[in-house]
Amino acid sequence: MNLMRRGDFLVIAHRGYSDGYLENSREAFEAAIATGADLIETDVRLSSDGTLYCNHDPDLERVRGTDRSIAELPDESLDELNVLRLSDVLEIARDRVGVLLDLKLAYRDYPVLVHDAVSAQGMQSSVVFGVRNVAQAQALHQRAPDAVILGFLNDRSDFPAFFVAGGGIARLWEDETDATSVAAARAGNHPVWITTGQRKDGTAGEIDEARLRRLIALEIDGVLVNAPHRALALRNETANLA
């Protein structure tokens, strides 16, 4: 799969098929793959033992019923709580689907650590590394010039510097997406992916048909959605009408 391609409206399953299954679970990822998603998306954090685990929030209260944080728990406890390791997610995806990693820690060399773990499993060509700032993009590009890097940047004005640093894909939120913001984020001919839903109200990944059609009309290159089957059906319908 060409993870940098433009114009195909890639469907990325946000935390897996999280509309119908527990987010970041094996079941959610398997369902997303079975539905035909182009990529699955997951969040990457470090345990107290230094192992990479997949969970969106810093703690496990919302999905596992404990307010303990990933960072303070050892591997044994996280495994008992059925939190997937990054290595587990990569094996689920191997030879089946691309993977977008949302790297939740903001220190400069964190993407390098994650890239080394991905490379150890021989999966680097199937992974998009989602970084939080320009410094992370620069560090990863220096370590792995061929890595595909997406920017989960808070400030859209940082995208030009992000691309100079080696970034390849711009991510915008749906509620800040219009023709002007897309053109600015593209900075020439870079792909733009959209996290659907709203930035601050807990609806990330949620979207209806009318809003999906608006994004298609804006020639967005990828969408992060909780229910990938809806976006896939609309993409197929649009392609058949072309």
Q: What role is predicted for each listed range?
A:
Residues 1-242:
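Phosphate-group recognition and catalysis centered on beta-loop-alpha active-site segments
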